[in-house]
């Protein structure tokens, strides 16, 4: 018997999905998806980026949760395997965050890392 549980290379939390749902509703464009990507830069060599995108490009991976989608390009995904996209609210403010087991060091800002 096969399991219905599919292990995804990147997790997308309920908190993040709920926030995306609210933001997409505010924009009044149901085709928007949260795209997470990695660029060179930041104090540790790489940094995470988040944007809303209404396009899915060839090779992109999508994760659907609660009626919204997270999109990751293949180049970024290789650095994010095993990670988790979450949304947090605290004294420092509210933001999407990535927990990345591949990051050897991270910066105090939380958005920069090295591998």
From Swiss-Prot:
Keywords: Iron, Iron-sulfur, Metal-binding. The keyword Protease does not apply. Transmembrane segments: none annotated. Binds 1 iron-sulfur cluster per subunit. Iron-sulfur cluster binds at residues 43, 107, 109. GO terms for biological process: iron-sulfur cluster assembly. Its cofactor is iron-sulfur cluster. InterPro entries: FeS_biogenesis (IPR000361), FeS_cluster_insertion (IPR016092), FeS_cluster_insertion_CS (IPR017870), FeS_cluster_insertion_RrpA (IPR023063), HesB-like_dom_sf (IPR035903). One of its GO terms (molecular function) is 4 iron, 4 sulfur cluster binding. PROSITE patterns: HESB. It holds the Pfam family Fe-S_biosyn. GO terms for cellular component: cytosol. HAMAP family: Fe_S_insert_ErpA. Homodimer. Required for insertion of 4Fe-4S clusters for at least IspG. Belongs to the HesB/IscA family. PANTHER family: IRON-SULFUR CLUSTER ASSEMBLY 2 HOMOLOG, MITOCHONDRIAL. This is Iron-sulfur cluster insertion protein ErpA. The gene is erpA.
């Amino acid at each position: 018997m096969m399991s219905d549980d599919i292990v995804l290379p990147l997790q997308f939390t309920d908190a993040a999905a709920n926030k995306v749902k609210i933001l997409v509703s505010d924009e009044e464009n149901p085709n928007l998806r949260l795209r997470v990507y990695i660029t060179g830069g930041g104090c540790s060599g790489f940094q995470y980026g988040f944007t809303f995108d209404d396009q899915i490009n060839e090779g992109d991976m999508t994760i659907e949760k609660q009626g919204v989608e997270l999109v990751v390009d293949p180049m970024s995904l290789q650095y994010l395997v095993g990670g988790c996209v979450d949304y947090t609210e605290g004294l420092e403010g509210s933001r999407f965050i990535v927990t990345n087991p591949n990051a050897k060091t991270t910066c105090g800002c939380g958005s920069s890392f090295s591998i």
